Amino acid sequence: MKQFMDENFLLETETAQDLFHNHAAKMPIIDYHCHLIPEMVANDHKFKSITELWLGGDHYKWRAMRTNGVDERYCTGTDTTDWEKFEKWAETVPYTFRNPLYHWTHLELKTAFGITKQLSPKTAREIYDECNEKLQLPEYSARGLMRRYHVECVCTTDDPIDDLRYHKQTRESGFEIKMIPAWRPDKAMNIEKPDFAEYMNKLGEVAGVTLTTFKDMVDALQKRHDFFAENGCKLSDHGIEEFYDEPYTDSQIETIFAKAMRGQQLSALEIRQYKHAFLKVSAEMDHAADWTQQYHYGAIRDNNTLMYNKLGPDTGFDSIGEFTTAKAMSNFLNELNMEGKLTRTILYCLNPCANEVIATMLGNFQDGSCPGKIQFGSGWWFNDQLDGMTKQMNALSVLGLLSRFVGMLTDSRSFLSYPRHEYFRRLLCNLLGNDVEKGLLPNDKESLARMVEDISYNNARNYFKFY
């Protein structure tokens, strides 16, 4: 019987072990999509407890705790202590067997704090106290944790109206790890939301544009896009339910925009026409700036209205959707390609039934301008686990070029999520090692090592043009 989470965790063959320990493990981390709070990096935030670091804002854990029968006050409440929240999480952990949370929890304890005991009610107090004691040390600050995991670059997720002051502060402080903003204009796209007009007014104010028409909005966005570029931004991200290809005219979009600004109800068709027009304009800006564009699609968000009204978005009430969007995706990418305005693109699906859809879509629009111009993003959100990442890499392997994959990202708000890169790299090495063991791949150590190092780091470094 193997030991739990020993040095060869997930590595089932000698080839896998060699690839990980001698190649993957030594590569720095480029975390090109995350949700870190820039202020915490800029001010080198010191965490008052493991509860703040681990449970503050982590909807993955909240979701598991609720499922385990834990009252909401121990997840998001303000009338419970840090210890009480941690204790409830420790009570939940033994029930997360076979959930990625169990692996993540113990990888984080091991790599950050050197703790190899399993978290449970029996060990909760001891682990809580040891973590909190270490969090008082300088090397456990926000920046210290990034250094610990050999992070080289992170890309935060930022709204067009953000002033990026904390990115500038971090840059000017001489911090050796790059923190780059990423453009996420969802609030300008979501015309059906009740606060759309209010947001447009804020956008106009920040951009210095009197915003009354769609053209005004595009002008305002372009100014903010330029501002982001001046501050080092190299990529955009769009959270969409599906792709849109409904035909529209400029006059139709102006009419739709005017209705929304007056607070009038829009039809489903009008909403889709606007989103198509918006994403088209956004893609044109990205192409002109030589950015990479990312599309995360397929989530049904904020399913629980009662809890949304209490807690807001991103609190653990989202799920996988069923959207038939392959044709619209193809039409949208083709439209950009026909006009010579299709920039480097990463496609992420939340529903794994679309893995092969995306993996085959990539080849339609590769043009030889760079390796893997159109990418299949790593297993996202609910797929960020062994089975989901395996399925994503298998689909990419058989229908594209796994060797040109830009690899892993945390997509996380936590400074303790970097072991997910290790988790991914171990899995990658194991997939290749097993293929060698079965005679499906040659035991070409040089080629295998290069492939692992490229997917772990080199491909992302070359693809995003951060340097």
Label the predicted regions:
Residues 293-295:
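C-terminal amphipathic alpha-helical interaction region
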Residues 308-316:
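Short glycine/proline- and charge-enriched loop/turn segments
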Residues 323-329:
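Divalent-cation-assisted or electrostatically stabilized phosphate/pyrophosphate-binding catalytic cores
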Residues 267-268, 317-323:
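A short acidic, glycine-rich active-site loop
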Residues 332-338:
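Short, basic/hydrophobic alpha-helical segments
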Residues 304:
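Hard-cation-handling environments
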Residues 2-289, 341-343, 347-352, 356-359, ...:
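Metal-cofactor-binding active-site regions of metalloenzymes
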